[in-house]
Amino acid sequence: MEGHPDIRIIAVPYDSGHPDRRMGAGPQHLLDNGLAESLRSDGRGVSITTVRHEREPPAEVATAFELQGLVSRQVRSAIDEGQLPLVLSGNCNTAAIGSLAGAENPGIVWFDAHGEFNTPETTTTGFIDGMGLAIAVGHCWKEMAKGVPGFNPIPEENAVMAWVRAVDTSEQERFDASGVVVVGPDVEGQGLRALEDALDRLRSRVELVYVHLDLDVLDAAKVGRANEFATPEGMDVEQLEAALDMVRERFDVAAAGIASYDPSFDTDGRVLRAATAGARALTCPASL
């Protein structure tokens, strides 16, 4: 469609290096249930590429960075061909680091229940997917990240984390000492206004952003559980769509990612429908 780019969906069906299980089952479930068709309904072309690693047996850390590199190449290729990359990933770090590298380091607007700001020195779980933002701003795994084509750390001030509400003590200390802007859950109706203010400040620094949607940003009670880590006090669908519209009104979106969807927790399909609405809001300008 003239004026609106075609979309390249980049599916990365892995959770901690393991294919097609837990959150790794999310990308294909979204595709099997009409995500691409919904995006095509506006008349734009939508192509689908699935990324697979060759590491056997998978090692979580090494595989994570291998997948990031594969995503980076796909994102770069899509942009070079005039397409909008939309990464569907089991894990956040794969979509985020790969997209940031492939898009040559735009700003970050990241929707997530969790801070993703631990490092190997602060984590109590060893879960690399709790370190995605820390990797993005150059706080950890620096040598491994150098191997991702196109990656350079993002300045902390160029990152906005939205609706974060499940943060470790060590993560909070790290946020307090950083330039990352953190917008918490909606309090007395001020959440969207606070996000709007944060986006306005970010707009004074960057024009191009990567938008990341971890589906556990959604309210576990009002919408449904996206995964085992889902929590209350999240966004409802209307808030999510309004927030994504705010982003599209202010920035050019270089790439977008949707992550952390475990279909086994979505027993009534409400998260699936919310994810589809989010994908449309991420990729379709309001004028479409």
Q: Residue spans of the language-model regions?
A:
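Conserved alpha-helical scaffold segments that buttress catalytic/binding sites
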Residues: 2-288
